[in-house]
Amino acid sequence: MHPSTSRPSRRTLLTATAGAALAAATLVPGTAHASSGGRGHGSGSVSDAERRLAGLERASGARLGVYAYDTGSGRTVAYRADELFPMCSVFKTLSSAAVLRDLDRNGEFLSRRILYTQDDVEQADGAGPETGKPQNLANAQLTVEELCEVSITASDNCAANLMLRELGGPAAVTRFVRSLGDRVTRLDRWEPELNSAEPGRVTDTTSPRAITRTYGRLVLGDALNPRDRRLLTSWLLANTTSGDRFRAGLPDDWTLGDKTGAGRYGTNNDAGVTWPPGRAPIVLTVLTAKTEQDAARDDGLVADAARVLAETLG
């Protein structure tokens, strides 16, 4: 994103779309669970979904964690929902939300320009699809709003690190989610180290249930003021990285706002909110990990798990 085009008409459209989506329902996080045999709008029972998810896990050789919450019916689907998984870039929604809530005042902080260098891009493992563009490096600065946006829409690691720096480091994200009632999710390191994803590591992790509820509070609840909630949702709606993951598994006419993540050991994640036509939204998370360090990520597993959720809850 070039600084001179930081407020394209697309953003206005996305913000309006986000506002319409937000008007559909407000998530009130609860503890209710659907019975195993319960049926709602979807064609399958929760117990059927759990069996299908177990089958996907066996076939893939990965560990699969899933949690989804239908805000209209209160039905849930849970599979390894309370196990810890590496979070990877799913954290970027949290860091951007923390900037909006804790640092921005009436949009003034969002318009501040942040200086950065090629070294910053390289320290983020060279993963700066927007910050590393020649035209952006030539100016050596992007606004806070632009950096938050591209950290989500393009999963720009350099942008995320710059926002972590403004927040005071990764621990600020942990403090932020604790203030939302999330006692599980934690961020300890910077990009790219946080993606090391060794089996058994507890740092830089979350659980499917915890991150689903936190995303729900941010997008559908009152964790952010309405203006910030619309802006965060517009970034999630504009995400470009989930085409082979959630987007591939959900029906084409379901609006999707999400954030992906990937790391070593085949870690491959997607978390977000989807709005079926004429229905209350569904908040959903799929987290996966394997046991071999150089294992390939399995986008199809994430897409297939999302498809099970859509067929069960949709």
From Swiss-Prot:
Identification of the protein by name: Beta-lactamase
InterPro entries, per database record: Beta-lactam/transpept-like, Beta-lactam_cat, Beta-lactam_class-A, Beta-lactam_class-A_AS, TAT_signal
Signal peptide positions (record): 1-39
Similarity comment text for this entry: Belongs to the class-A beta-lactamase family.
GO biological process, one term: response to antibiotic
Organism whose genome encodes this protein: Streptomyces albus G
Domain of life: Bacteria
Location of the region described as Disordered in the Swiss-Prot/TrEMBL record: 31-50
Lineage: Bacteria, Bacillati, Actinomycetota, Actinomycetes, Kitasatosporales
Keyword annotations from UniProtKB, A to Z: Antibiotic resistance, Hydrolase, Signal
Catalysed conversion reaction: a beta-lactam + H2O = a substituted beta-amino acid
Mod. after translation: Predicted to be exported by the Tat system. The position of the signal peptide cleavage has been experimentally proven.
E.C. number(s) listed in UniProt: 3.5.2.6
MF annotations from Gene Ontology: beta-lactamase activity
Disulfide bonds: none
Entry binding sites for substrate: 259-261
Misc: The class A beta-lactamase family has a specific amino-acid numbering system, sometimes called Ambler or ABL numbering and often misspelt as Amber. A multiple sequence alignment was used to derive a consensus sequence and then the consensus was numbered taking into account insertions and deletions. This allows use of identical numbers, e.g. for active site residues, despite differences in protein length. UniProt always uses natural numbering of residues, hence there appear to be differences in numbering between this entry and some papers.
Pfam families in alphabetical order: Beta-lactamase2
Location of the active site: 89 (acyl-ester intermediate)
